[in-house]
């Protein structure tokens, strides 16, 4: 078993890390203050190729494997999560459905402009009464004439205020179906824009469909297959989100070690106090363990597997582990860690907290894992 990255993958990883450290983390206080991603930062992400991670090369993207995308997302986790979420939704769950299940006309219309950032994508699944229970969604799409009429209400939709279109899920006569809904379609509007504790700049809001008319060609794949498509998008999305958690945990660990080497108490550096040294060791162990599980999930997806249990395991371990690691880092910084905008730890703490909630809460991940075990998905097949 060889864990060595290829030269190309190391270059990819380093280019994203350099972008995050030089552009993302250098201006994070401004993002926190304005709750806006600077245009130059989005353009920088485009120039590195981050807006086209999932888009095939023939449409102007990078066409990366899931493992390669996971490398990128781990590096994104080192920076502001508002930027990471913007990129993740645009080129991840807001894009993968079109890439994998869209027809040739849909790909030709949307993907080239998504790769350049001219059009920003979003993913509209969550509703006020159906978050983790996505299959309980109430938005309906009624077939009328040569198209559909949508009625419903989506919430917590990342990128919605800036989106050109939404990969949207609604009930049809055949079951839950997926559609590409342009934001300027008649009857589509943006509702409340949320003021979030972390993820500053990501723009999260409600999306309202009131007799919204869309053409028949907006349907992705077949009617009634929407949840199958959503699950595939979410398995990959949970894997790359888990990678961001690992990246955040790694960044917190590095900051904590640096601080513990410099800060002195009782005549010696913090890191020489055994209690603090053990805490740092635990932070490192959690991060390394989660990283292995995350990349295992990514590898399974690249082999054509569904990775349902594996992606949920990665999400659960990475989110919970990174949260504990970031909280431990804040504890090491003491009072300075709780001062907003001082040492970056407070931003990591606020950004990371929601990872235990969205894309399926930690409780839901345990339900998914247990459900797979009941179905006989017990063995860890390395072959």
What residue ranges belong to the model's regions?
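Long, acidic (Asp/Glu-rich), low-complexity accessory segments flanking structured domains
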Residues: 210-229
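Alpha-helical interface subdomain recognition
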Residues: 1-83, 89, 101-106, 113-118, ...
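Short Gly/Pro-enriched turn/cap motifs at secondary-structure boundaries
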Residues: 114, 129-132, 156-159, 171, ...
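Short Ser/Thr-interspersed hydrophobic loop/turn segments at strand-loop and sheet-helix junctions
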Residues: 49, 72-77, 170-173, 181-186, ...
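A short core secondary-structure module
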Residues: 147, 151-193
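Short glycine/proline-enriched turns and hinge-like loops at secondary-structure junctions
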Residues: 64-65, 133-135, 159-163, 200-202, ...
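A short, Trp-centered hydrophobic/proline-enriched beta-strand micro-motif
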Residues: 117-125
């Amino acid at each position: 078993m060889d864990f060595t990255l290829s030269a190309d993958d190391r270059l990819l990883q380093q280019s994203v890390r350099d972008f995050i450290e030089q552009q993302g983390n250098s201006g994070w206080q401004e993002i926190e203050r304005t709750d806006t991603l600077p245009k130059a930062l989005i353009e920088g992400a485009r120039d590195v190729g981050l807006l086209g991670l999932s888009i095939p090369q023939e449409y102007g993207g990078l066409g990366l494997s899931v493992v390669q995308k996971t490398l990128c997302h781990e590096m994104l986790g080192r920076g502001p999560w508002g930027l990471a979420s913007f990129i993740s939704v645009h080129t991840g769950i807001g894009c993968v459905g079109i890439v994998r299940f869209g027809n040739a006309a849909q790909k030709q219309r949307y993907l080239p402009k998504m790769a350049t950032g001219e059009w920003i994508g979003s993913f509209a699944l969550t509703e006020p009464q159906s978050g983790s229970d996505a299959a309980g969604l109430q938005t309906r799409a009624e077939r009328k004439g040569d198209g559909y009429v949508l009625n419903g209400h989506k919430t917590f939709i990342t990128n919605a205020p800036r989106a050109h279109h939404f990969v949207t899920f609604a009930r049809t006569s055949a079951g839950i179906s997926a559609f590409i809904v342009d934001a300027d379609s008649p009857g589509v509007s943006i509702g409340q824009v949320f003021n979030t504790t972390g993820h500053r700049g990501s723009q999260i809001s409600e999306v309202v469909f009131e007799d919204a008319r869309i053409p028949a060609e907006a349907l992705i794949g077949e009617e009634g297959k929407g949840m199958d498509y959503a699950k595939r998008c979410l398995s990959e999305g949970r894997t790359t989100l888990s990678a961001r958690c690992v990246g955040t945990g790694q960044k917190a660990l590095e900051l904590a070690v640096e601080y513990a080497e410099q800060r002195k108490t009782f005549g010696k550096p913090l890191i020489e106090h055994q209690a603090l040294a053990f805490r740092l060791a635990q932070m490192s162990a959690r991060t390394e363990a989660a990283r292995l599980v995350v990349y295992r999930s990514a590898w399974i997806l690249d082999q054509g597997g569904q990775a349902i249990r594996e992606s949920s395991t990665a999400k659960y371990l990475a989110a919970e582990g990174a949260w504990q690691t970031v909280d431990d880092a804040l504890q090491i910084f003491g009072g300075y860690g709780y001062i907003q905008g001082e040492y970056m730890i407070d931003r990591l703490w606020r950004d990371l907290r929601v990872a235990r909630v969205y894309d399926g809460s930690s409780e839901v991940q345990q339900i998914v894992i247990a459900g797979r075990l009941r179905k006989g998905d017990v063995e860890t097949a390395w072959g």
